[in-house]
């Protein structure tokens, strides 16, 4: 019996550990490094391992369900006419968990407490799903307070009070650095799939993830989740590569703010935006955004009009000339972005983006032809595909 158990553990360790290594801005991130991979045996042990200061490779080999573990709250939530009532909408709306309700009315609500407080991930951690079994249900992950060198790979984070705005965030970065978020799936979240700020997120690679916005409760009243990615950190460098964002309706992503000293460089490459009922990119001030090889299919607004006026610097690579003009500063020809059945994609070629990107040349990832994006991304993004 002991021999069988030992064989199973050894097989598990061999099968599930970090696959590959990050490219782009999170290059060099090692997470738990050479620590022996191990699967926790209880929720308490899972939380302890994630939050302590010991380097670890934590295997998620089952569904860890936090719903109900910290009780529920029954009280009043705010119902807003435009996001909750949804007259004429195709889905239910989202009520708001908050202490004010200007312009709305109070309604009775009941929500789960566990989702409101994410697990704080310690430094030098790899949190890795086994096959397609790794699920964290009802609670998110947060890297903050100077913690760094974290890998989150092959995990499905789901069911954080999806019927309520402010119901919970899946992944939070706040005063962090060296974070690789790879081959995960995020679905049915109350607030943001990924959020950064107000402190720095640091050097981050977000690659090969599936952002699944299908929901029965939508602030856009259209069955598509609105709160996708909100990037507001003080000094942030993002590689956003090979991700599949589908059936969402906003902040996909939003980046930048004038409320802090936020400074963001964002390199978006070979991502697939599919069936977006609202906007994809929404760019504010103090940002430098290089976009190439992204495919927008059935996206109502690939780039908001506000993005063109808010002061952010954009290189949208929408023409052959714009693609070729990358060569002088970056040393390669950029890949153009492609639209199918989508709204307008504005041509912006701010030289400041190329100048800044040239200083990060070693962190710029390569691209493949944009025509290949839908098939390759769908085949590769999400859990069970590492």
Swiss-Prot record:
Its main location: secreted. InterPro entries: Pec_lyase (IPR002022), Pectin_lyas_fold (IPR012334), Pectin_lyase_fold/virulence (IPR011050), PEL (IPR045032). Glycans are attached at residue 124. One of its GO terms (biological process) is cell wall organization. One of its GO terms (cellular component) is extracellular region. Gene3D superfamilies: Single-stranded right-handed beta-helix, Pectin lyase-like. Disulfide bonds join 77-101, 326-334. It holds the Pfam family Pectate_lyase_4. It is found in: Secreted. The active site is at 251. Keywords: Carbohydrate metabolism, Cell wall biogenesis/degradation, Disulfide bond, Glycoprotein, Lyase, Polysaccharide degradation, Secreted, Signal. Its EC number is 4.2.2.10. GO terms for molecular function: pectate lyase activity; pectin lyase activity. It catalyses: Eliminative cleavage of (1->4)-alpha-D-galacturonan methyl ester to give oligosaccharides with 4-deoxy-6-O-methyl-alpha-D-galact-4-enuronosyl groups at their non-reducing ends. It comes from the Eukaryota. Residues 1-16 form the signal peptide. Belongs to the polysaccharide lyase 1 family. Pectinolytic enzymes consist of four classes of enzymes: pectin lyase, polygalacturonase, pectin methylesterase and rhamnogalacturonase. Among pectinolytic enzymes, pectin lyase is the most important in depolymerization of pectin, since it cleaves internal glycosidic bonds of highly methylated pectins. PANTHER family: PECTATE LYASE 18-RELATED, PECTIN LYASE F-RELATED. This is Probable pectin lyase F. The lineage of its organism: Eukaryota, Fungi, Dikarya, Ascomycota, Pezizomycotina. The gene is pelF.
């Amino acid at each position: 019996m002991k021999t069988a158990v030992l064989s199973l553990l050894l097989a598990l360790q061999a099968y599930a550990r970090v696959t590959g290594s990050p490219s782009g801005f999170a290059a060099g991130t090692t997470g738990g490094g050479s620590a022996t991979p191990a699967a926790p045996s209880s929720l308490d042990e899972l939380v302890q391992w994630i939050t302590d200061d010991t380097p670890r490779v934590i295997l998620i080999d089952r569904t860890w369900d936090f719903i109900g573990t910290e009780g529920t709250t029954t009280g009043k939530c705010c119902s807003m006419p435009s996001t909750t009532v949804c007259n004429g909408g195709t889905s239910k709306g989202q009520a708001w968990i908050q202490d004010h309700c200007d312009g709305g009315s109070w309604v009775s609500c009941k929500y789960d407490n566990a989702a409101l407080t994410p697990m704080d991930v310690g430094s030098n951690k790899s949190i890795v799903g086994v096959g397609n079994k790794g699920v964290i249900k009802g609670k998110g992950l947060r890297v903050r307070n100077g913690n760094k060198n974290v890998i989150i790979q092959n995990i499905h984070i789901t069911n954080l009070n999806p019927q309520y705005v402010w119901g919970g965030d899946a992944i939070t970065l706040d005063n962090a650095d060296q974070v690789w978020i790879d081959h995960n799936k995020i679905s049915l979240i109350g607030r943001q799939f990924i959020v950064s700020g107000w402190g720095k997120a640091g050097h981050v690679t977000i690659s090969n993830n599936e952002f699944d916005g299908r929901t029965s409760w939508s602030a856009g009243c259209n069955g598509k989740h609105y709160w996708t990615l909100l990037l507001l950190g003080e000094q942030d460098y993002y590689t956003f590569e090979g991700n599949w964002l589908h059936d969402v309706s906003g902040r996909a992503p939003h980046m930048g703010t004038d409320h802090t000293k936020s400074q963001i460089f964002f390199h978006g490459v070979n991502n697939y935006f599919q069936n977006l009922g609202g906007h994809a990119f929404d760019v504010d001030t103090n940002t430098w955004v290089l976009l190439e090889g992204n495919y927008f299919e059935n996206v109502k607004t690939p780039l908001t009009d506000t993005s063109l006026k808010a002061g952010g610097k954009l290189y949208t690579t929408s023409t052959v000339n714009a693609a070729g003009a990358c060569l002088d500063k970056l040393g390669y020809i950029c890949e153009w972005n492609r639209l199918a059945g989508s709204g307008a994609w504005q041509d912006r070629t701010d030289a400041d983006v190329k100048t800044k990107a040239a200083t990060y040349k070693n962190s710029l990832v390569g691209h493949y032809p944009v025509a290949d994006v839908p098939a390759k991304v769908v085949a590769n993004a999400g859990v069970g595909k590492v």
